[in-house]
Swiss-Prot record:
The keyword Membrane applies. InterPro entries: FIMP. The lineage of its organism: Eukaryota, Metazoa, Chordata, Craniata, Vertebrata. It comes from Mus musculus. GO terms for cellular component: extracellular region; plasma membrane. The keyword Membrane applies. Residues 1-23 form the signal peptide. One of its GO terms (biological process) is fertilization. The gene is Fimp. This is Fertilization-influencing membrane protein.
Length: 111
């Protein structure tokens, strides 16, 4: 890159750090680009703050946005077997890597 380009980037970064130029528009300082446009509507947060177990609210929101709701049925099988297999695999992998490390490391001084 040429020196003048680096100088321009440095000046721009300095001005952005000092606050003399805006790097992104602020919400309260923006105006609508079309005359007669309404300001942005505030989203009602309480409508969206619902627990995942509230099936009626989930179905209502799914219908509102036009999705086909998917419901998952909890089965009687416990995740204990899968969790035991996963933890056992991770432990075996850890000891295998530790064994490989100890096998290839030479603890003698000098080389």
């Amino acid at each position: 890159m040429k020196l003048w380009l680096w100088v321009a980037v440095g000046v721009w970064m300095l001005m952005a750090e000092l606050g003399t130029i805006e790097t992104a528009p602020r919400r309260d300082g923006t105006r609508p680009s079309v005359s007669g446009a309404r300001p942005q509507q505030v989203v009602n947060r309480l409508f969206f703050d619902y627990p995942d177990s509230d099936r009626a609210s989930l179905l209502a929101v799914a219908r509102f946005i036009g999705e086909k709701p998917i419901t998952f049925v909890k089965t009687d099988s416990s995740p204990g077997l899968f969790q035991n297999i996963l933890v056992g695999t991770l432990v075996v992998a850890f000891f295998f890597l530790l064994f490989q490390f100890c096998l290839h490391v030479n603890f003698q001084k000098g080389a």
